[in-house]
Amino acid sequence: MWLHGNAITYPNEIDSRTKRFFDENEFKTKSFEGLDSPDIYDETDADILIDNTKWPWIPVPIDVPHKEIFEEASHLLETGCFTAHRPQSSGWMSLCIHGMSSVHTNVPEDYGLPDEWEEDESHWTDIARYCPRTVEWMKDTVRYEKYTRVRYMVVLPGGWLYPHTDRDRITGVGATNIAINNPDGCKLVMEDWGEMPFTPGSVFKINTGYKHAVWNRSKEPRIHMIFDGEPGDYFKSKVLEGYKNHA
């Protein structure tokens, strides 16, 4: 019954570039061994690791009440609160819990605003009151030192996100991605690395300097969260733990 009565349009058919990217990369596998130098593998400072690793992703072992968060995010989707996110995609939608506003889901530059607004003007948006369990978890478990943009990210059934990079380098990991659900048939694929191993409740620091794309071939929305901001000491310790456990 999701989307019943809503004006959200259904996704367009996947474009040839994204389809070709999936054909070429979906089933690739590649070892992380030797990707980082020995001094990075032995690093005990999480900041140095986060800034210098070349891993495409790092699992972060923290607990996520993903079923409760899914209920809150689904309700907001059903009631038409999400906005379309970025061109060159279809069925990709977003909603800010923390940021410049609930609908400013991209960087300030995309709205003709100064870059510093990301830091200076981010706050709990009006949407935060409608997802109290999500906010509680962010405050009590994730415990970032400072949040900037924190978003629910939805890919509708049949939706896709074109191959792209979010940074101009492959050194260091960027935003945090949390799988609230991850329906069978929906995949994030990285060039040369294949499918990211998302399961409901999994958390990763992602190296978005590698080209990646998403395609939801399931019959249900795929709901994730993306965190931007400054991780606190607890979260950074879990990044280091996840790295060491998989090195």
Feature map (PLM): residue ranges:
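A short beta-strand-loop-beta hairpin characteristic of the jelly-roll/cupin
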Residues: A179-T199
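Non-heme Fe(II)/2-oxoglutarate
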Residues: M1-T141
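Tight coil/turn sites that cap or link beta-strands
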Residues: P157-G159, G201, G209
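Short beta-strand His + acidic residue motifs that chelate non-heme Fe in jelly-roll/DSBH
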Residues: Y162-H164, K187-L188, I206-S218, I226
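A short glycine-rich, His/Asp/Glu-containing loop-to-beta-strand
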Residues: W137-G159
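A short hydrophobic beta-strand segment most commonly corresponding to one strand
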Residues: G174-I180, V203-K205, E220-S237
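Short, conserved beta-strand element in jelly-roll/cupin
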Residues: V154-L156, R169-G185
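A short beta-loop-beta micro-motif enriched in histidine and acidic residues
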Residues: K146-Y147, L161-A175
